[in-house]
Amino acid sequence: MIMLNIGPFSFHSRLLLGTGKFPDFDVQQKAIDVSEAEVLTFAVRRMDIFDAKQPNLLEKLDVKKYTLLPNTAGAKNAEEAVRIAKLAKASGLCDMIKVEVIGDDRTLLPDPVETLKASEMLLEEGFIVLPYTSDDVVLARKLQELGVHAIMPGASPIGSGLGIVNPLNLSFIIEQATVPVIVDAGIGSPADAAFAMELGADGVLLNTAVSGAKDPIKMAQAMKLSIEAGRLGFEAGRIARKRCATASSPLEGMSVVE
């Protein structure tokens, strides 16, 4: 398969995995291992990365094996998002940042105006910017025009498990994209992840679908395989949809024994 390229980074795996809500660290680590994810995301605000006395994800993971993608979860405006991103950078983490500016506490949908503003400000600061956005086609294009390094449209609200509720809009975003499209949020099953890849997405970022599963380790493996299958299917090219049947076996040139 073709590698996933985001800014200066190249990855074999197209599964980006969140690190929150796992039952315990052992389950988390095993799930990460079987997923073969190379990019791990986490909320900067949920860790005291400057306090050595406070245990956190970075202490327990072999961070040299992964590319870390800190996110600005908890930010309510562009200024807060930029502040969180700078905190992550100052701690020595990757310059790549997932911009997350929530505009509605009930749906956890992103604020389009503040997301645009934060993305522009962080690009000016030299960050590799991956904004979490809705399935708004125009907003995705405007983010792309700013120069972001990937676009991360939600399939449905964060943690909902509803899957891809608007595949048409998602397909429009993918068709117009000149940067990678990573489907983020709302994935609930391996079928959802495979569908995203079949639509032409470059990758899938998920967390709750794995960490909240009855068996997170098995689900991590299932997501890995479904994303690989969906991508292979997209690269192979599906047959055209037709209204009428077409015989799969040739009828001409066959001798009929009476």
Swiss-Prot record:
In its keyword annotation, does this UniProt entry include Repressor? no
Q: What is its EC number?
A: 2.8.1.10
Q: One MF term in GO for this entry?
A: thiazole synthase activity
Q: Which organism is it from?
A: Bacillus thuringiensis subsp. konkukian (strain 97-27)
Q: Where is the active site?
A: K98
Query: What HAMAP family does the entry give?
Result: ThiG (MF_00443)
Any one Gene Ontology biological process term? thiamine diphosphate biosynthetic process
GO cellular component: a single term: cytoplasm
Q: Which InterPro entries match?
A: Aldolase_TIM, Thiazole_synthase_ThiG, ThiG
Pathway field of the UniProt record reads: Cofactor biosynthesis; thiamine diphosphate biosynthesis
Q: Where in the cell is it found?
A: Cytoplasm
UniProt name for this protein: Thiazole synthase
Q: Could you tell me which PANTHER family the record lists for this protein?
A: THIAZOLE SYNTHASE
